[in-house]
């Protein structure tokens, strides 16, 4: 079983070393800079407009794919969302549906090298950590997403996940009925700017007030979520 406290260490620590890792090495003198790596991570610039009702995981993946394709990507995209076991189907862990990395944003900055670093699976991985900040967690157009201090604040990201990227197993609803409801339930949220809340986690900070668009806005979000290229 993964250690949640190690994942929490990675979630709460952002150092200059991570920023250095995200930079491309300078080209030799007299040579043009190499092109940035293709985008493989972004925050969705728009959700479903129906709160946490995304049409299930498949609907959320379609949103990621549509936005990425419009931005010129030819990769296959999945939403970073967990789902609870239901109707005879096993739980789905967000961490298991996003490929293996590395992941780069629309400006070529590396967000994480692999799944272990993204979540801080081990002490070593937690020390390396990820580069998830307001500066790097941008949308597919390369635009910054509003965070704490901006109006309106939109830093809440739908994840339905624990710190280690797995689905909750306590029997409570953390996914607004597996992303099909805009009425009953709650959704677990992360903060893309890693500001506010107890653990300043990018993927598991606090639950929403509800599942409607109005509830998500009132909590400090807009029904947005993370998208990762799986190839």
Describe each PLM feature range.
Residues 20-231:
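Secreted/extracellular ectodomain signature
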Residues 8-18:
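Bacterial N-terminal signal peptides
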Residues 1-4:
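Positively charged n-region of N-terminal signal peptides that target proteins for export
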